[in-house]
């Protein structure tokens, strides 16, 4: 059974709303979104010590699942390259007095934002749906569902593959034997959040393209005509996101993004 707020929206969808009606409904939406976000933020803040040890700092340890997969692949196919056999561990240091507290706060904030994304999309859908025609409602609902799923797939790929590869490369990169690499807590968290969220946003390509097609700015012929250009752009973006420079990392990041780019044409046709 829909909530009273949702019922009010759908009861009024057959008559034209005034500017103040829209503003009042938007205010309710913002309050609900902020309420859900606040609950997640408090929960993450309380659980942050455990999350740091078992999730956020997991890529620092040699037993992280992706490193185990690399070693298994190397052992199975008799690959002796250091990429597959490297033993890896990173110890972070803190050089700012207040850094642990602010990192605690900011990490809880961003985790709560990511977790609340499905609910935010749901509220967006519920707010705009009364103004749409039935066929537009079906399209927007499908696009928001796809966008939510793809965002979390991108976040998972960033966490389990892209960031560990980047961390392992940059933390072991040696400019001079006289320079010892010591990674600060702030540097680790900044790069962690940036890469994971960038992968999530990169996976929103189908949703963005669908919205552009809805506005008549992108067409099937355009996507097919500039397919090769898109591949070059994807490789460049992958190189920026993962500054490791090795072909393997560029490949594992570029392939999913390219497949998404190809799927956009299909999504454009069937949505």
Q: What are the roles of these predicted feature ranges?
A:
Residues 7-269:
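Membrane topogenic/interface segments and analogous intrinsically disordered interaction regions
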Residues 1-6:
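Extracellular interaction modules
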